[in-house]
C-alpha cells in the first residue's frame, strides 16, 4: 500500500530521471513509467481525494517536472471520474507522464519564455517538442501505440487550433483529448 505522498515523490524523481536520461541520449524507461502509471491509477481508485489534493501542492521544482506530476495525477482522477477502465487509465497516465519528453531537445532559453513572450519563430520551434517526443518513443521498444498517440495529440484542440497537425473534433484520439483537458487544467490553475 503506497502512500499518496510517497508515490508523488516517486513520480517526481522518475520524471527527473526520465528527462535526464533522454537529455544524455538514453532511451525511455517505459517499464518503469508503466509501473508508476499503474501505481497512480491504483492510488486514485483507492483514495481519489487524498491523491488529488496532494497534487495541488505547488512544487518548488522546475515547472515542467511539477506540471507533469500534477497532470498525471489529474489524468488518473479525471479518468476514474469519467469511468475509464484500468487499462485505459494506465495508458492515459503513461502518456501524460511522457508527454513533455521532447522538451529536453529544446534550448533552455526557449523553455523559460511563456507562450505570450515567444516570437512566431520561437513558437514554431517550441511546438516541435511534440514530434521530438514522438520520435523518441517510437525509437524505444515496448511503448504502446496508445501512449504514442497521446503524446502526439495532447496539444490538439477540438476546434482545430492545436498542434502539431491541427486536428479537429473526433479526429483527435479520445485519450489524447482527455490528456489535453487535464494538462490545460493544470497549466491554468498553476
PLM regions: where:
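Extended, charge-enriched "interface" segments that sit outside catalytic cores
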Residues: 2-8
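Histidine- and acidic-residue-rich, metal-dependent catalytic cores
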Residues: 11-190
